[in-house]
């Protein structure tokens, strides 16, 4: 089994009311980044991450499309821990938190979702 394709999208989700706090300031929407990982058997897993406001979403999307996709293609989607380690080591020089962590977490969720679908189990199991 191999990862055949990765597709990503960026959505700006408006909040029903403006939120504010001392760390993030005014928040009118969230930037939601989705990752779809398809294996060579046609199954697809969906993962996501988000940032607050207009910063970070486009950068996370760019990292997924330009850096992470090439690292994932051809990998065994069942080997989730090894893929996590591979991504962490490949990206840790550009940041152990923030955008790199957001992107890796979206991939991780998509891989677990794909595994759950393959095993006909709910994701929480």
Q: What label would you give each PLM region?
A:
Residues 121-125:
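Short, intrinsically disordered, charge-balanced linker/junction segments flanking boundaries
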Residues 1-53:
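Structured beta-strand/loop patches that form or line metal/cofactor-binding pockets in enzymes
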Residues 38-118:
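Metal- or metallocofactor-binding catalytic centers and their adjacent structured scaffolds
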């Amino acid at each position: 089994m191999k990862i055949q394709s990765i597709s990503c999208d960026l959505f700006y989700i408006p909040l029903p009311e403006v939120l504010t706090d001392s760390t993030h300031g005014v928040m009118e929407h969230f930037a939601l980044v989705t990752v779809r990982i398809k294996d060579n058997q046609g199954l697809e897993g969906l993962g996501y991450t988000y940032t607050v406001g207009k910063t970070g979403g486009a950068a996370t999307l760019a990292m997924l499309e330009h850096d992470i996709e090439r690292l994932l293609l051809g990998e065994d989607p069942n080997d989730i821990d090894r893929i996590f380690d591979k991504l962490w080591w490949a990206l840790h020089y550009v940041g152990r938190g923030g955008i790199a962590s957001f992107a890796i977490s979206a991939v991780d969720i998509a891989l677990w979702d794909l595994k759950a679908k393959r095993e006909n189990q709910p994701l929480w199991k």
